[in-house]
Amino acid sequence: MEQKAKEAASHAAIPVSISAMLVTLGVVYGDIGTSPMYVTKALVAGNGGIGSVTEEFVLGALSLVVWTVTLLTTIKYVLISLRADNHGEGGIFALYSLVKRCGKWLIIPAMLGGAALLADGILTPAVTVTTAIEGLRTIPAVHAVLGDDQGRVVAITLAIIIVLFLVQRIGTAKIGHAFGPIMTLWFLFLGGTGLFFVFQHPAVLLCLNPVRGIAFLLSPNNHAGIMILGSCFLATTGAEALYSDMGHVGRGNIYATWPFVKCCLLLSYMGQGAWLMNNAANPELMGIADLNPFYQMLAPGLRPFAVGLSTVAAIIASQALVTGAFSLVSEASRLDLMPHMQVFYPAETKGQLYIPMVNNVMLVGCVIVVLLFQNSAHMEAAYGLAITLTMMCTTLLLFFYLHEERKLKVAPWIFAAFFLLLEGFFFVSSLTKFFHGGYFTILMAALIMGIMVCWYNGTAVEQRQFTLLPLRSYLPQLKRLRDDDRYERMSDNVVYLTKDTHTDYIDRDIVYSILDKHPKRARAWWFVNVETMDEPHTFAYSVETFGTDYVFRVHLYLGYKINQRVNAYLRQVVQDLAATGELPPQTHDYSVYKDPGNIGTFKFVLIRKLLAPESDVEPSERTAITLKYIIRRAAGTPARWYGLENSNVSFEYVPLFTKFKAVNKMQRLAPNERP
């Protein structure tokens, strides 16, 4: 009962409604919803082309597609995975956070699966948009303009992708409301055109029998062998993104919309199959290079509308991966697998976020993919390999969630055995894609995982030396320092930003910075912690003075919609304390204003750790720390995250308090003596 109440509360912020369902259709289903554009095309090409199409092939291949979508998307993700949410957030990192206490080694499948999903997400916009734009060639008037010059297709594709990433900053809610009605029309178009051809050849419904798929997989007429599963898998690559996007739309809205989406998808696949059975012997089709049944089965007058609609749907397909990537990186940052990055919340729901750095990196990656592979056939060959790794990792983590958190005994073992075996077949069948382009996503996944490993290991080394000191024990020293005229006053107010939320304790590095690294004399020291709240508009603070008028522990409680302008908020706190007499007036004689007020100057000190050359650490640890600090510099500066760009900020490096290597004692020589 407690578990069910917890789940219900986590999704209460996004109730099921027509509006939310439209957002769900616009944000979540783009990837899986555009699969009909290229799945049947890949199946036909893999079996030897239109000349090798038989009724056995069509029914067998479609049966494999139908049951791939049913088993992986419907059963594994919609019915099982969506139940495993972390305060409403989905995705492999949210799942790991639920089971990490079950074993430290589970961080490995979490990092591998997350890295593979992010890498595959870079390929998705390229392959879907390129496929849609290539559909223009099925329109004679447009083909006369474009011709067979792939460079023009590439240029149009790049323009669309760049615009897609530029509009991310306005938020997924606004994008979803714009895309939702279009995706509804898209799915109705898929279902309607598919149903039209199913009526013409009702025998295609025999593909719903799973025996047809298994029999064809083992049949000598299956020219692709087990590799046919690699093409079938393309029909469900968007399932993992569906799980990752749960925080944007809520589980209930996915439950409400998936039956409609699945029916339309299956009708489209069966409609293409029915058209193939009716036209397999058509000699005119034999001469069409790179035949795509999705476009070819449509009447010539309907193709311009279909190409235009599929282009927009392809853009929305990219959106599903982009929004999922934002959620994944946000979760990874909380788990200390990636650096902290600047995050914006354009909507009223915390799950809808925008991370500029992730957006820019994915944009560059998509552009590279388009320029490297040029056409959709090459991209399809690379597509899907990495995502099979993600699905296997998700299955493993779900096993521990069901077994350890849900306390189920037998069901988790059956679940893991079945889906790991099934996904293992898909992984083996996709391995042939490695040398045809799959290497790119594997290399990207390896790069992303390398960043995670370095950040995770580097953070582990730092945390081993992390120590909190009782702040009250240092009040006498701070009082003496405040009154010690031998040291020049650094500023009226010296401010440190802290990660820890303890009131009575302080990070040793901060105490070391104030007292040991050239004493930082001030009228008052401020230790400020910023906590982002689940409510969007929370705007409050608390202060602990320790009975002094020179040491202040400030907690800022800011809703996720509130800009973190620490300088401005701290000045308000100072004014409040000055008004109550808890802070003595900080008068100063020089100012551009006629009334300088009673608030003095501020100096913000941001701590950065430094590993000294003589530190006694393992070479692997030294490498991890060094690489972490390189990544940290690339990730941006806290001065920008906390709105301190125009403030007086200094970065101070403090050493990691590790053991130091013993050094030999030097021999002292006389002034004129030489060794």
Role assignments for model-derived ranges:
Residues 2-675:
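The structured alpha-helical core of multi-pass membrane proteins
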